[in-house]
Regions:
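Active-site-adjacent betaalpha module
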Residues: 1-31, 64, 68, 95-218
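Short, contiguous, helix-prone interaction/anchoring segments in small proteins
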Residues: 25-62, 74
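Active-site loop/turn elements of alpha/beta-hydrolase fold enzymes
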Residues: 37, 78, 175
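Conserved catalytic core of two-component sensor histidine kinases
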Residues: 53, 157, 261
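Von Willebrand factor
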Residues: 66-85
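Hydrophobic anchor at the start of a short beta-strand
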Residues: 73, 170, 274
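Acidic/polar short surface loop at catalytic or gating sites that assists cofactor/ion binding
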Residues: 82-100
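Phosphopantetheine-dependent thiolation modules in NRPS/PKS and related acyl-activating systems
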Residues: 217-297
Length: 297
């Protein structure tokens, strides 16, 4: 048995189930998980399927807002041509799975990861099974997980259930997930709301993320300190571009190694001590905001 074809439905967003949990989403404690949005898993949907189109658009907005807020973003991705012994019981239900062809393995372009995002190689329904996702979340000081992607009643639900059992609060975004059909989508939301997580809409997620989007008040003034430290080290137009695009690379904008040391020294004087090697691997505003957020926490 393989994946079905011709999936085409409207997401069941009217009368969403009331979540038993009353947790409030906190951007300072949250991470985003983009679940299984590889081309192999979205090919079964018809072109323009409303549920998938909505899920991709909502996921794209959430990912952009998360990066701007310094919230970690994780992606799950399966490997192609899995050994049958490693694929295990999944092969009995879904066949051999994807090949190594990028037409199968690539994450769809609308929500493609940036260099600052993390990829989790997935092995089973749950994103936690045989992965280091839990360790990565703990290392980042995150105990809330915003989940988007496919398929709602399979991997999304399995991940939400295991997150709950690991004391991680799952927030499943009703309009940022898709499924094999409306009934499976609805049942997934009902199960999650009833026993393991909060069912939430993308607009509410965006509101929570944007309240921590790196503004002066939300970031404890670190944007101003970063800007002050870079003043005189970058051309004014490059400095403007750096803050306009939080994923832009400082070195591509004109910062050299000597000036980078001066920049890090200035931040250290303000209480943010950063490793030069780590900084050179991710010289972006989003990375700096995440480090500043961990100091503030």
């Amino acid at each position: 048995m393989t994946l079905p074809v011709g999936i085409d439905y409207e997401a069941p967003l009217h009368d969403l189930p009331v979540s038993r949990a009353t947790w409030e989403l906190d951007a300072g404690r949250a991470a985003v998980l983009v679940h299984d949005l590889q081309r192999y898993f979205v090919t079964p949907f018809t072109d323009g399927c409303p549920a998938l189109a909505g899920a991709l658009a909502a996921t794209e907005q959430i990912v952009r807002a998360a990066r701007a807020a310094g919230v970690p973003v994780f992606y799950t991705a399966q490997q192609g041509d899995q050994d049958p012994a490693d694929r295990g019981l999944q092969g009995d239900l879904w066949g051999p799975g994807m090949s190594t062809d990028p037409a199968h393995t690539a994450i769809v372009a609308e929500v493609a990861p940036s260099e600052t995002d993390a990829i989790v190689e997935k092995h089973r329904y749950s994103a936690f099974a045989r992965t280091d996702l839990a360790d990565r979340l703990a290392a980042a000081g995150r105990n809330q997980l915003i989940i988007t992607g496919v398929y709602a009643h399979i991997g999304v639900t399995a991940t939400a259930l295991e997150a709950f059992q690991r004391e991680i609060h799952p927030f499943v975004v009703a309009d940022a997930v898709a499924d094999l059909g409306a009934e499976q989508h609805r049942r997934a939301l009902e199960l999650i709301a009833s026993c393991c997580g909060v069912v939430i809409l993308a607009d509410d997620v965006l509101g929570a993320l944007r309240s921590n989007d790196g503004s002066s008040e939300a970031s404890g003034g670190w944007d101003e300190r970063i800007q002050s430290a870079l003043s005189g080290l970058l051309a004014p137009d490059a400095l403007t571009a750096f803050f306009a695009d939080p994923d832009s690379d400082l070195f591509e904008l004109g910062l050299d190694s000597l000036r980078a040391f001066d920049f890090l020294d200035a931040l250290a004087d303000d209480g943010l001590d950063l490793d030069f090697g780590e900084f050179t691997r991710s010289p972006t505003l989003n990375w700096l905001r995440r480090q500043a957020g961990s100091v503030a926490a």
